[in-house]
């Protein structure tokens, strides 16, 4: 490959990464704004984040986690 082609490819990769990093930052700000809006309407943001995390688990893992949590709560009388 010629140096010109390599330089152009590198510039394209860098440009794409920069664009995606900016999009990621923009999306992160949008998510933050949504949480702030939900909070201002009385929703518990911490609970919402927990729900989002739980939704990512498959049903078997979620059931296992729920069972373990219930066992620990019962053991500790909570």
Swiss-Prot record:
> Would you tell me the protein name for this molecule?
UPF0335 protein RMA_0160
Top-rank taxon, per record: Bacteria
InterPro entries according to UniProt: GapR-like, GapR-like_DNA-bd
**Molecular-function GO terms, alphabetical:** DNA binding
Task: State the family it belongs to.
Answer: Belongs to the UPF0335 family.
What is the organism of origin for this protein?
Answer: Rickettsia massiliae (strain Mtu5)
């Amino acid at each position: 490959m010629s140096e010109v082609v390599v330089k152009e490819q590198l510039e394209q990769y860098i440009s794409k990464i920069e664009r995606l990093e900016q999009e990621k930052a923009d999306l992160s700000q949008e998510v933050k704004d949504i949480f702030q809006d939900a909070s201002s309407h009385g929703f518990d943001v911490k609970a919402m984040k927990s729900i989002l995390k739980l939704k990512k688990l498959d049903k078997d893992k979620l059931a296992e986690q729920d069972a373990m949590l219930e066992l620990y709560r019962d053991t500790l009388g909570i």
